[in-house]
Amino acid sequence: MAEKKQWHETLHDQFGQYFAVDNVLYHEKTDHQDLIIFENAAFGRVMALDGVVQTTERDEFIYHEMMTHVPLLAHGHAKHVLIIGGGDGAMLREVTRHKNVESITMVEIDAGVVSFCRQYLPNHNADSYDDPRFKLVIDDGVNFVNQTSQTFDVIISDCTDPIGPGESLFTSAFYEGCKRCLNPSGIFVAQNGVCFLQQEEAIDSHRKLSHYFSDVGFYQAAIPTYYGGIMTFAWATDNDALRHLSTEIIQARFLASGLKCRYYNPAIHTAAFALPQYLQDALASQPS
């Protein structure tokens, strides 16, 4: 039997992961980054940008459920949602499940990602691009949040790692812009890497976000695709109570929403904010 081709992730120099490639569906350099979508027997369709896995069909539901339902149910009455990035459409898919949301704006820098994912990752977007509440804006996220006249109740930064096009979405200019267009008691969340291996990302985000928000923290989820353990999500708001809502309150909102999830549930919601001691210590050691 012929040996299968292997695709190796290039995020880390000294260690990493590989995927056997059963079939390359698409591989091109877009206007902004190198994009590949291939099939793997264990994880289904896999998308990578600039040598880093972004999503797989097998476990994407964990990431997208936690990035959407945690802030939306914590907020409780979000009407207007902004997604930065998210070109594969799965974040949009999860937001559209909240029937009380009135408008969903997605800002994606790379139109190529959107068009190719609509074709090759249909299970991710599940026709959510056709939702009448949805508006797509092709623009740089930093530019959008600093220029828009719109305001939002929840902002979800579905960014890549802080390299290439995603680097600007970890800057003070971006965080300041998000604060600018976030409504009172609004919530900002962002992908923040695997903290055991990328601890400096969390420390840097915490320091920068603390300049603009009174309550800054993190929550976590175990996502197999993201090598190294537990994925960390940044959380920022000026309503300190929202991070500490009881499981009972979240349970009532969850039941009222009618959501059916595969990973997220109210107990997971509240437990996700419990951080390992090494991360607590690292954050506490930083100058205020």
From Swiss-Prot:
It catalyses: S-adenosyl 3-(methylsulfanyl)propylamine + putrescine = S-methyl-5'-thioadenosine + spermidine + H(+). S-methyl-5'-thioadenosine binds at Q33, E108, D140, G141, P165. GO terms for molecular function: spermidine synthase activity. InterPro entries: PABS, PABS_CS, SAM-dependent_MTases_sf, Spermi_synthase, Spermidine_synt_N, Spermidine_synt_N_sf. Spermidine binds at H64, D88, D158, C159, T160, D161. PROSITE patterns: PABS_1, PABS_2. Pfam families: Spermine_synt_N (PF17284), Spermine_synth (PF01564). The active site is at D158. GO terms for biological process: spermidine biosynthetic process. The keyword Cytoplasm applies. Its main location: cytoplasm. Homodimer or homotetramer. Belongs to the spermidine/spermine synthase family. This is Polyamine aminopropyltransferase. The gene is speE.
